[in-house]
Amino acid sequence: MRFVLDGSSVGSREALHRALRETLSLPEWYGKNLDALYDCLTDLREPVELEVTNAAKLCESLGGYALALLHVLRDSERENENLTVSWQE
């Protein structure tokens, strides 16, 4: 499945995790933090493509947290062959 996360609609950490939960249909136990996101993404059993659009806006809004998100997404992608992540400015 293909999912798109629009970085221009994310203005805070809380909004980011809410958008990720809704976009990816994450489980109820999702802890709304990067460690929980990693756990969910590395546990995917079906192929998932996640495209983050307006990444520059996401970085502007979240600063260093956006960089931490990028690391989590890349690490999750390396760990789980069912996950593909792309970023678009």
Language-model features, listed with the residues they occupy:
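Positively charged, polar, low-complexity stretches
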Residues: M1-E89
